[in-house]
Amino acid sequence: MDSLKIGNITLPHRAVFGPMAGFTDAPCRRLMAQHGAGFTVSEMVSSRALVYHDHKTVSLLKAEPNGAPYGVQIFGEVPQIMGEAAAAIEEYQFGFLDINMG
């Protein structure tokens, strides 16, 4: 299978494991990476909850050292809040940020 390049990340193949709220938690991402997912993405995370440091939401960001690039998906409706959430996520140094566009 051909590799896939997204920005400065090169994935070994085009098989990826996308974000699913309530499903793609840390153990699930670890399992998918072990079975060859080119990258994994967090559950969908509320930008507003991140900005307000909601404990449950922040816990969704737990990274697993599984070798596959790991990204975070955020959603929201207020551009300023989305920007603040993206800045907050930057400190975690994930491979990429995915914005859910509806």
Where are these regions (language model features)?
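Glycine-rich, positively charged N-terminal anion/phosphate-binding segment
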Residues: 2-5, 20-95
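Short beta-strand/loop segments at the ligand-binding rim of alpha/beta enzyme cores
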Residues: 10-15, 68-71
